Amino acid sequence: VKVWFQNRRTKYKRLHTDGKEILSDSNSKDQKSLSDDDEDSDGDGDDNDDDEEDDELVKRDESEDNVLIESIHQNQNNLKFENETLSKHSISESSKRINVNTFSIQNPYSFTENKQFTPSKECQQYIDHSKLNNPLGSQIINDLSEKSKISDYTKYAWNSLKQIHDNLNIDNGIERKQSSMLHSSQHLLNTVNQNLNYLQHSCR
């Protein structure tokens, strides 16, 4: 606070003196170059009067500032801080209505235990297609569909699903073997034809 008042005094004094110098410079430019000694002495007297007025203004400002600073210090000393222990968050009415037990952890399989599941359209098409192409695995498909209706599908482990998938695609495995044999025989036939062509050209 003291620094602020001191800066205010210096700024005020600087502005006041600078303004006086600017006015005196402008007046000196407008006045004639010739002047009497009496006029110079009168000017010095005016300057002395102005300096006295400036000193009085500065003293008055200083006294007012000191009174204000003293009152500020007194007010600061009179302040009393009461130690209050407040809760971090006040409990609102909406927070009181929230029941924590509403979001209890449940068994992930319990909600599907007693529900009946029906296959989707795509699943039903796959089942029908598999029945037509694999009559031997129709019983397995029926068992699987019945299990899916009364139990959760996620209970089956991946190995069991893989085994069921392999059982349903027996013909696909045979077809893969047949295509592999066909590819090998075709490759062998192409090799024989190339050798025959080579022999024919060499005999000529």
Curated annotation (Swiss-Prot):
It is found in: Nucleus. SUPFAM superfamilies: Homeodomain-like (SSF46689). GO terms for cellular component: nucleus. Residues 36-56 have a biased composition (Acidic residues). Residues 15-35 have a biased composition (Basic and acidic residues). The lineage of its organism: Eukaryota, Metazoa, Spiralia, Lophotrochozoa, Platyhelminthes. Residues 1-15 bind DNA. Keywords: DNA-binding, Homeobox, Nucleus. Disulfide bonds: none annotated. CDD domains: homeodomain. GO terms for molecular function: DNA binding. Its main location: nucleus. This is Homeobox protein SMOX-6. Residues 15-63 are annotated as: Disordered.
